[in-house]
Amino acid sequence: MGAMRKATFLAVLMMISGLAGCFGGDEDENTEEIVAVFTYSPATNIRSGQTIDFDARDSLPAGVALTYKWDFDGDNSIDATGRTADWSYPEVGEYTVELIVSDGSKSQSTTKTLTIVDATALPPTADITSYSSDEDCEGEDVDTGSYIHVWVCDMDKSNTDRTADSEISIELDAEDSTSGSSDDYISKYHWDLDIEFDADGDGDPANDNDLEGETVEWKDLSPGEYEIGLTITNGKGLTDSDDIKVYISYAASWLDFEMGGNTSGSPVELDFEFLVHYDQDRGNTIRKAVGELTYPKIDGDCTDITPGDGNNCRAKLDLHAFNEEDEEATNTSNTAVDQRKDGDCNSDDNDCVHLTLSSYLFTDSESESTYGDGEWTIKIRNNRVNDLQVESLVIRLVYK
């Protein structure tokens, strides 16, 4: 009898143990936050009677059984269920669409406003005016195309300011945009000054309203490459967009300054700084940077250590380029003194030596021959004992 009671007790104990997970059961309940997200197509210029496809597949959390309820007309009643749905609106106007997503224990909703326009309305055409500077900083013609290319010429900078940098303002013009029909008009001009960055956080990086107006001034623009967008809306509520590349190239020069001589066993250097952009994800990539140094072959104040020798008076200045980690990328030291006629060096009394930094140098790869973008420095280096009056240094940042 005792053995039977013991067996019965063990059986009951095992049954209770097996049912332990069935009671009090919060452990398996989903604790992740519900995030309701939906898109719709077409996203713009939706016409009365047109079928609109709604999709909530981006709602979170992924991998969890969710339910979806749609209210398409703002009357707080459910018009459709399911992760996808379609709807149409017979009348022109604005409609609020609500999506409610639930995991059975909690829910979250989101709303969007749709503008429905007349089925016969004509869309506008957005058109950003392209243009280029007439000349670059050398007086050469600048190519034109379906882009904006502006040269900034910061010539004859002070020798106490050895940074190649400047900010300018440029004009953006949409006067060639059209409303769609002769009896319509353009009611809104919205400019997005960086179509890769979602400034308003609505999930669309190309629809930010940074500036408004048919013609606007874009201020505080530094050398670089930019992609901007324009969205216009006509009186019927239809929209159209255009985008364009903007290139700001730059040149700075320093004229008639002194370069000290190496009288202590260490070369004398002058540093000139410039900022380089090479960001492929943002589409801001420099094409090349160039340093151009012109100096007299022989300094007028030079005295030979050995009278009549002349070797001591033959100048040789070099350009050395360093990235922001102070790693040297390249230099001109291997260019012989009788080979220094780069560019338009038309004087027999001067040396002209150029240092070109291609875009490849500014990439950020695993290769030992690339150095990244950011703050760079060009150093003028004098290894020789005599000082020298330099005629000019030019730094060009070419983005187109």
Question: Language-model segments: which ranges?
Answer:
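Acidic, Ser/Thr/Pro-rich low-complexity intrinsically disordered segments
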Residues: 266-342
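A short beta-strand segment in extracellular, disulfide-stabilized domains
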Residues: 45-60, 156-179
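Secretory targeting signatures
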Residues: 1-40, 44-47, 52-58, 68, ...
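C-terminal edge strands of extracellular/lumenal beta-sandwich accessory domains
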Residues: 236, 252, 307-327, 366-400
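Solvent-exposed segments in extracellular or luminal domains encompassing
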Residues: 83-94, 207-225
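C-terminal edge beta-strand
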Residues: 85, 110-117, 238-249, 393-395
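Solvent-exposed loop segments of extracellular immunoglobulin-like
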Residues: 61-69, 180-190
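Conserved structural position at the C-terminal beta-strand
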Residues: 101, 232, 380-382
